[in-house]
Amino acid sequence: MSTLKKPDLTDTKLRAKLAKGMGHNYYGEPAWPNDLLYIFPVVILGTIACVVGLAVLDPAFLGDKANPFATPLEILPEWYLYPVFQILRVVPNKLLGIALQTLIPLGLMILPFIENINKFANPFRRPVAMSLFLFGTVLTMYLGIGACLPIDKSLTLGLF
């Protein structure tokens, strides 16, 4: 059973703390022993059971052995590097491709200074940041999909 400690609102010291915004964590269900002995082990065991269950149901097998005499036509990087690979593959000048890669972190560093007047946490009330985020997300997905296609179809995604 959990132990609940009810506040005594007639206490003047407690009322002074509550007026200052303090005391909200003093009451309710205690972390020891309820959370640390009962809830956390259940979550940890549930996570382990989920990982083991997924490993048993769908094991990840190793691929074919590497053959040094049969090189594939195009070697693709890991999935999270597809947009970068696509930029470097499509841009004719490699120095320009590297310069485009440096613009991404520079744009992310400049973004807070562009819209520092608006202090709202709601992203829909911050149109510049929201539009740049959506544009970047769509562009990243477009480049990632294009990297999986042959180079002649990569810019149009094979649609035209």
Swiss-Prot record:
CDD domains for this protein: cytochrome_b_C
InterPro entries, alphabetized: Cyt_b/b6_C (IPR005798), Cyt_b/b6_C_sf (IPR036150), Cyt_b6/f_cplx_suIV (IPR005870), Cytochrome_b_C_euk/bac (IPR048260)
Molecular functions per Gene Ontology: electron transporter, transferring electrons within cytochrome b6/f complex of photosystem II activity; electron transporter, transferring electrons within the cyclic electron transport pathway of photosynthesis activity; ubiquinol-cytochrome-c reductase activity
UniProt keywords, alphabetically: Electron transport, Membrane, Photosynthesis, Thylakoid, Transmembrane, Transmembrane helix, Transport
Record flagged with keyword rRNA-binding: no
Major place of residence: membrane
Gene Ontology CC terms, in alphabetical order: plasma membrane-derived thylakoid membrane
Membrane-related topology note: Multi-pass membrane protein
GO BP: any one term: photosynthetic electron transport chain
Membrane-spanning parts: 36-56, 95-115, 131-151
PROSITE patterns: CYTB_CTER
Gene3D superfamilies tied to this protein: plastocyanin oxidoreductase, Single helix bin
HAMAP family (alphabetical): Cytb6_f_subIV
Quaternary organization: The 4 large subunits of the cytochrome b6-f complex are cytochrome b6, subunit IV (17 kDa polypeptide, PetD), cytochrome f and the Rieske protein, while the 4 small subunits are PetG, PetL, PetM and PetN. The complex functions as a dimer.
Family: Belongs to the cytochrome b family. PetD subfamily.
Function of the protein: Component of the cytochrome b6-f complex, which mediates electron transfer between photosystem II (PSII) and photosystem I (PSI), cyclic electron flow around PSI, and state transitions.
Name used for this protein in its record: Cytochrome b6-f complex subunit 4
Organism phylogeny: Bacteria, Bacillati, Cyanobacteriota, Cyanophyceae, Synechococcales
